[in-house]
């Protein structure tokens, strides 16, 4: 099933900011999400921010996709997540993913940390 993932892309110096235009990051979009972001990782070396401001829900498929994307980033730059809603933030805490991923409140703080 060919789900197309719309992702807004912005570049600031060596940082690529990706904002997936999807409400639910779950099994139905995980493959499309992964391939779209993997393509961005391949095209733009450097640090990556995934902006969750449009995402309301994430499940284990979405989390697994983020882990595999982080592995792809290995050696290419840092991957930071920002603008997680309280429910998603809680999911990261419960699964201890908050220890694996760098998470910032908003895009500006994520950019500031990456530019340190």
What name fits each language-model region?
Residues 1-18:
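Short beta-strand/loop segment at the start of cytosolic alpha/beta domains
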Residues 24-101:
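Amphipathic alpha-helical interaction surfaces in cytosolic regulatory modules
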Residues 86, 108-109:
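Acidic phosphotransfer microenvironment of two-component signaling modules
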Residues 102-106:
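Short acidic-hydrophobic, aromatic-tinged amphipathic segments that line or gate anion-handling sites
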Residues 114-116:
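A short, charged, amphipathic alpha-helix used as a generic interaction element across diverse proteins
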């Amino acid at each position: 099933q060919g789900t197309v993932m719309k992702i807004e892309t912005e570049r600031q110096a060596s940082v690529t900011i990706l904002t997936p235009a999807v409400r639910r990051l779950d099994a139905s979009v995980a493959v499309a999400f992964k391939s779209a972001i993997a393509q961005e990782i391949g095209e733009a070396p450097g640090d990556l921010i995934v902006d969750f401001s449009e995402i309301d829900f994430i499940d284990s498929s979405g989390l697994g996709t983020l882990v595999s994307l982080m592995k792809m980033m290995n050696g290419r730059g840092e991957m930071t997540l920002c603008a997680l809603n309280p429910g998603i933030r809680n999911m990261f805490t419960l699964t201890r993913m908050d220890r694996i991923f760098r998470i910032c409140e908003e895009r500006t703080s994520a950019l500031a940390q990456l530019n340190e």
